[in-house]
């Protein structure tokens, strides 16, 4: 992004911030809690950007003063040296701030702030793939707990030999989608299964879909498009087990999506949860379609976000996790223990780098 474009966008952000300040002082806005919350949230989002822009303006002024001092000190070598050092430090601070502001102005995914549903499905590899799906679920649970997110399994189909054929996990928290969206795709594991007597390495896979939570207004579902039936939920022994039909089997005819929900205690809760899952799945389909159209015009994403894309291999023998989008290796134990900060951070950095390159190319055009 060239300097003139950067300043223009920063001035626009500054004007928007000042306008929001005026709106917050308006009694009519103060009397409307919903509008007040919306305006206050947008003001909070812009405040760090505007503050950094003001810092940049101050540093630019100090740079001009330092340059003037360098010229005035040519007859005094010691003073000139001090002035040049001061100018060098100011220029360094200025460049760092410009970099920070440029990143802050990069296009944001409007869904980045949302909570998500993670759908993990066992792929190729039979029983070992089911065990691997369970390992991935625990990895994300540990990562979410570290960040203070609320991580809760809401639907699952257990496998006979352990692990899961599929599992849907609700992950609620701040900016969850902005991080976990890079986890969508095929996760491949290479290891010796516990049942392997010859010590041979097997390759298994599991797919991860990352679905941002959808608002009912955002994804409209017609009641005529649904087929809903109830079933008895299984569970540990007891007089009430299987006597009340609390499970919900929901089928969306236009998309062919089926959701079976048994985790909640009541039929109404399971129905609400099933509808929540269905909305997220339908939104994921919309996003996938939009991404496919966008990729035909440009290829600037870190990965496609498609659940069929092979994104990572976990090699137990070499204690190595390879992210194929980045071409970078990470320690296996670190990743599986839920320490995904380095991996996801590298994906975010690569995405920002590509976005900046695209903006630069647009400026040249």
Curated annotation (Swiss-Prot):
Residue positions, PTM N5-methylglutamine: 239
Subcellular location, record wording: Cytoplasm
Swiss-Prot/TrEMBL keywords: Cytoplasm, Methylation, Protein biosynthesis
InterPro entries: PCRF (IPR005139), Pep_chain_release_fac_I (IPR000352), Pep_chain_release_fac_I_sf (IPR045853), Prokaryotic/Mito_RF (IPR050057), RF-1 (IPR004373)
Record keyword Glycosyltransferase present: no
GO cellular component: cytoplasm
Any one Gene Ontology molecular-function term assigned to this protein's record: translation release factor activity, codon specific
One Pfam family, short name: PCRF
Post-translational modification: Methylated by PrmC. Methylation increases the termination efficiency of RF1.
PROSITE patterns xrefs: RF_PROK_I (PS00745)
Broad class of where this protein is predominantly found: cytoplasm
Similarity field: Belongs to the prokaryotic/mitochondrial release factor family.
PANTHER family reported for this sequence: LD18447P, PEPTIDE CHAIN RELEASE FACTOR APG3, CHLOROPLASTIC
Function: Peptide chain release factor 1 directs the termination of translation in response to the peptide chain termination codons UAG and UAA.
Designated name of the protein: Peptide chain release factor 1
UniProt gene name: prfA
